[in-house]
Amino acid sequence: SISGRSLAARLADPYARARDYSETQIRTAQQLALQELPAGWTLDWQITDWTVPARTFRYTGLTPLESIKRVVKAAGGWLYADRFAQTLHAVPKWPQKPWAWDFVPDMSLPSSYALKETRQAQLGTAYDAIMVCGGINNGLAVLVTRAGQPGSDPAASVTDSLITDLEPAKARAVQELADGWPLRQYSISLPLQAPPAGAGLIMPGTTLDFVDGADGWRGLVVGTSVSVSSTDVTQDLEIISP
């Protein structure tokens, strides 16, 4: 068998050294992430940015990749490595809210492409609010409520010292509420073929319509793996849908 890792492995153990660090200057979140990258690397920042006070960003025993993930997670983001370049992409973990699942998807996937499809339910709770706190040094505490809801059924509160502004608090609230939402989980296997014969490689973060007549549905790809045999190349997708 053949296995591999992305270029971002160079920013993680055992290739990159873990260190202890405390930022003594005021920085934006994006600046904190950028300064962790060695020369030759770039950062595609697609999440909210905000100001972080001095001595708020501190850590012990983290590699560059781990420390950047720490910053991105504060605002409900997800970090992934580019397939070809020395680039990290910071994007919202949930590009669409599961309680507002009305959007134009990135692509359509005909059911005829699927070799196998399985489905299971993920239990969850449709909470309508969550308290997001910035830690004892920042004094930020915000009750974020879903639009049009009373906020009478909140999820367990979350605390993150890097949440020092309202915008990351709101973004983190979306991620926390969405992670606990009642969902359906689909596993789909299909041949890896370039269009128009197939769908091409479908990456995590892609939104799609699974076209199957009255049984079709709309989902978000959260995992992709590729397997190779002597005769076939197959991609296996993990997809979630409210």
Language-model segments: residues:
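A residue-level signal for beta-strand positions that form part of recognition/binding surfaces
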Residues: 1, 87, 129, 218, ...
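Short, solvent-exposed secondary-structure boundary/capping segments
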Residues: 1-6, 226-241
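Charged- and aromatic-enriched interaction segments used to assemble
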Residues: 3-122
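Solvent-exposed, flexible loop/coil residues
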Residues: 15, 131, 237
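Acidic, small/polar-enriched beta strand-loop surface segments
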Residues: 69, 73, 79, 92-231, ...
